[in-house]
Regions:
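Basic side chains
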Residues: 30-32, 51-52
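Short glycine-/small-residue motifs
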Residues: 167
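Short, contiguous, helix-prone interaction/anchoring segments in small proteins
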Residues: 25-30, 36-39, 45
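Vicinal oxygen chelate
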Residues: 2-24, 48-123, 132-158, 170-178
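Conserved active-site tyrosine of GNAT-family acetyltransferases
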Residues: 37-42, 65, 135, 162
Length: 178
């Protein structure tokens, strides 16, 4: 069966040929301390660092992370690896502005408090109960557990910078919104 888009007001059902080949590559979060953020995203959520880029003249670093198989062929050449990183799908970019990690009261706005803006990232997992147990074992803070609230079988955790991360098991969501 081929893909058929849902029809809603404002939806262009036939994307222009000029957009063929466009790929959603990454979304970016600003982080206070890259060591803490990288530990969370690699150890707790299983992402791998694809590339780090430093910009000393502007005093910031970019870390690009994604889920990749261990046997994935990654270019050794720095330029080729950068180009490869920007060709991937589902990448998370963490931006660290140098010095923020030493400011005790420094905090980024997560977008969920007023004024609202950015909401959350979402990770799908094969077993929601096992994921919840994993997060509990590692003392990851929950915003919402799967059995709380009106929307069941959906969890929200927080990363070290307070950003919300939705955790879902796709098979449990078949009746969502029905």
């Amino acid at each position: 069966m081929s893909f058929s888009t849902e029809h809603h007001p404002g939806v262009d059902t036939e994307p222009d040929a000029a957009t063929r080949g466009f790929v959603f590559n990454h979304s970016m979060l600003r982080v206070k301390d890259p060591a803490i953020a990288l530990d969370f995203y690699t150890r707790i959520l299983g992402l791998r660092v694809l590339r780090k880029l430093d910009f000393p003249e502007m005093r910031f670093s970019l870390y690009f992370l994604a889920h990749r198989p261990p046997d994935d062929a990654v270019p050794d050449d720095a330029g080729e690896r950068t180009a490869w990183t920007f060709s991937q799908r589902g990448v998370l970019e963490l931006t660290h502005n140098w010095g923020s990690e030493t400011q005790a009261d420094f905090k980024y706005h997560d977008g969920n408090a007023q004024p609202q803006g950015f909401g959350h990232l979402c990770f799908s997992v094969p077993d929601l109960d096992a994921a919840v147990a994993w997060f509990d074992q590692h003392q990851v803070p929950f915003v919402k557990r799967p059995d709380q609230g009106k929307m069941k079988d959906v969890a929200f955790i927080q990363d070290p910078d307070g950003y919300w991360i939705e955790i879902v098991e796709p098979a449990r969501l078949k009746k969502l919104g029905c």
